């Protein structure tokens, strides 16, 4: 049996980093990609320490040429890509009134278009081989809109809809599986970077929004801090468990907290399988 090949974006730290290690420990050959190779040392050392088959490559999901070059290089070495994990992304908290057009486009370009570009690049080989699994990292913010996160949530709602639509016809026709992962708070550089960005920019300066923003920041620290959120390794384990399922769910919450937080949106169809079957009827099947 040939070794399975996994491609992960945003693997320099946090969830991508931990998922790369776990999959390699399971016997996968992992192509762990990142925008900035200056950040590769920690993953490189961890792979060497554990004698894991991890190949680190440069890939920027906001640049088509970068994606095409990386995927082309991989497919010169491998027959196909078995698993794609679209993990690269960033948080952003700002009111619509205060966000610049450049900031809004940056979020869409990274969090949503990055997923679409990567899927477009990898799906052809999966379809040709009639097998594969594409994992898109979303958030509870892809199901429930949250204060000061409307721009971030809009990108994650987009990831949810994109995944759901592909699962409705590509999966049953070509045996390419799709799952969207919906964590709550993760103790990672993602959260740390968001908090640092908020603090460095002074948060929300508008007097009318300021009291609301201060309350939000208190809740953010409470819900996303140690003890009330998951570690990157815990969420990575959920991802690996999902990949190993014969018939994986379309939607995957990663904790009891995320299940509870999204229950009003998900309780009628927790796995997304019922909706997948319903939408499939649009194909006349």
Question: Locations of the language-model features?
Answer:
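A glycine-rich helix->loop->beta "capping" turn
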Residues: 52, 73-84, 92
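Active-site helix of classical SDR
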Residues: 119, 155
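Substrate-binding pocket helix/loop in short-chain dehydrogenase/reductase
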Residues: 95-96, 100-105
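Residue(s) in the substrate-gating loop at a strand-loop-helix junction
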Residues: 139
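Conserved glycine-rich cofactor-binding loop
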Residues: 12-14
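The beta1-alpha1 cofactor-binding region of Rossmann-like NAD(H)/NADP(H)-dependent oxidoreductases
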Residues: 58-69, 101
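SDR active-site lid
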Residues: 171-248
């Amino acid at each position: 049996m040939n070794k399975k090949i996994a491609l992960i974006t945003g693997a320099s730290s946090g969830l991508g980093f931990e998922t790369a290690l776990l999959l390699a420990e399971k016997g996968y050959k992992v192509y762990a990609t990142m925008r900035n190779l200056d950040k590769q040392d920690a993953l490189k050392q961890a792979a060497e320490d554990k004698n894991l088959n991890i190949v680190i490559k440069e890939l920027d999901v906001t640049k088509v040429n970068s994606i095409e070059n990386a995927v082309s290089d991989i497919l010169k070495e491998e027959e196909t890509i078995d698993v794609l994990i679209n993990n690269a992304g960033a948080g952003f908290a700002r009111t619509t009134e205060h966000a610049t057009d450049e900031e809004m486009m940056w979020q869409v370009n990274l969090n949503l278009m990055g997923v679409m570009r990567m899927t477009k690049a990898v799906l052809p080989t999966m379809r040709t081989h009639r097998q594969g699994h594409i994992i898109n990292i979303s958030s509870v913010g892809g199901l429930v809109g949250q204060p000061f996160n409307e721009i971030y949530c809009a990108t994650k709602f987009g990831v949810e809809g994109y995944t759901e639509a592909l699962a409705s016809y590509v999966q049953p026709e070509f045996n390419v599986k799709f799952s969207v992962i919906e964590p709550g708070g993760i103790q990672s550089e993602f959260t740390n970077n968001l908090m640092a960005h908020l603090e460095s920019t002074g948060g929300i300066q508008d007097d009318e929004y300021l009291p609301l923003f201060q309350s939000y920041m208190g809740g953010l620290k409470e819900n996303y801090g140690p003890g009330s959120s998951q570690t990157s390794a815990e969420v990575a384990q959920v991802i690996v468990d999902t990949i190993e399922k014969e018939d994986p769910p379309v939607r995957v919450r990663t904790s009891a907290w995320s299940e509870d937080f999204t229950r009003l949106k998900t309780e009628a169809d927790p796995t997304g399988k019922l909706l997948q079957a319903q939408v499939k009827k649009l194909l006349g099947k």
